[in-house]
């Protein structure tokens, strides 16, 4: 997190992917593109995970910002080569992020005001000394700026309307120490994007994009020091577009994925893992 705070904040928002682009072998094409390119590869060949569970989408609809808030996702491991055997299907890199467990002793938070969005962030105890949380909620006001501009256009027949784009995201992390042997965690990332365009005085186009990524896990440590780890992950993406005009058109797409993982660790070198 300290490293992220040292780089310029694009549009007033700190971004994890912009920070990764300052590390060796990783670049980004421009300030308004959240995609990263590892050793010359394509930006779509990077896998983004939390607790080894894949994220539905790393960036918002128009690509202005990523969906990751460093207030919560402030620790990560980047694999640019030599991927562990558990990772597969992506060719370029894997970024495995670990959510902040929160503060089990006191509350803390911050409010950020950027050029295109604002955010409210808070962390603290749910049950002091046992259960903590961290939460972040971000919303944009780009759509308000565009709406004011479009109303100021004198000739509504001209095709110079500004697209009305809005994005929102919410990130929540919970960490609970039930006993000396049991620990439970949960993580959720939810995004809502909307894009409305007036192509001309007769044709309007609306597009909605929603994603959800979540996982929950439990660790059990018996008396002999071994570790048994269970984790269940879910991700989904939903998109829908509609055009109103002379010929109405529309369409949509839904995608869901569920994975279960069991890991047994006997020592630093002896690990066994099963995926479902």
What do these predicted regions represent?
Residues 1-83, 94, 100, 117:
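Periplasmic N-terminal accessory/gating domains of Gram-negative outer-membrane beta-barrel systems
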Residues 107-111, 131-135, 184-186, 228-232, ...:
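Transmembrane beta-strands of outer-membrane beta-barrel proteins
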Residues 116-139, 156-194, 206-228:
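Transmembrane beta-barrel wall of Gram-negative outer-membrane proteins
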Residues 16, 34, 91-93, 107-109, ...:
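Hydrophobic, lipid-facing positions within transmembrane beta-strands of outer-membrane proteins
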Residues 146-152, 187-191, 195-204, 233, ...:
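Outer-membrane beta-barrel translocator domains and adjoining extracellular loop/strand segments
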Residues 63-66, 74-85, 93-124, 132-139, ...:
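Short strand-turn segments of transmembrane beta-barrel domains in outer membranes
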Residues 80, 99-101, 115-117, 126-128, ...:
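Transmembrane beta-strands of outer-membrane beta-barrel pores
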């Amino acid at each position: 997190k300290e490293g992220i705070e040292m780089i310029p904040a694009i549009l007033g928002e700190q971004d994890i992917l912009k920070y990764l682009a300052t590390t060796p072998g990783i670049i980004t094409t421009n300030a308004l593109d959240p995609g990263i390119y590892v050793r010359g590869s394509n930006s779509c060949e990077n896998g983004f995970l939390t607790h080894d569970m894949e994220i539905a989408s790393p960036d918002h609809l128009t690509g202005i910002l990523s969906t990751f808030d460093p207030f919560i996702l402030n620790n990560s491991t980047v694999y640019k080569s030599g991927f562990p055997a558990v990772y597969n299907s992506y060719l370029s890199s894997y970024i495995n992020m670990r959510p902040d467990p929160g503060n089990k002793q006191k509350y803390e938070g911050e409010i950020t005001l950027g050029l295109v969005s604002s955010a409210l962030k808070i962390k603290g105890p749910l049950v002091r000394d046992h259960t903590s949380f961290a939460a972040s909620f971000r919303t944009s006001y780009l759509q308000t700026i565009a709406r004011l501009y479009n109303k100021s256009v004198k000739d509504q027949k001209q095709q110079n309307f500004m697209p009305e784009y809005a994005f929102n995201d919410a990130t929540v992390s919970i960490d609970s120490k039930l006993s000396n042997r049991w620990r439970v965690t949960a993580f959720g990332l939810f995004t809502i994007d909307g894009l409305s365009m007036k192509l001309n005085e007769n044709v309007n186009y609306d597009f909605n994009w929603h994603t959800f990524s979540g996982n929950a896990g439990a660790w059990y440590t018996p008396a002999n020091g071994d570790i048994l780890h269970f984790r269940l992950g879910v991700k989904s993406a939903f998109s829908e577009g509609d055009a109103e005009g002379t010929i109405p058109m529309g369409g949509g797409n839904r995608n869901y994925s569920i994975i279960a993982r069991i890991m047994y660790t006997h020592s630093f070198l002896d690990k066994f893992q099963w995926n479902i």
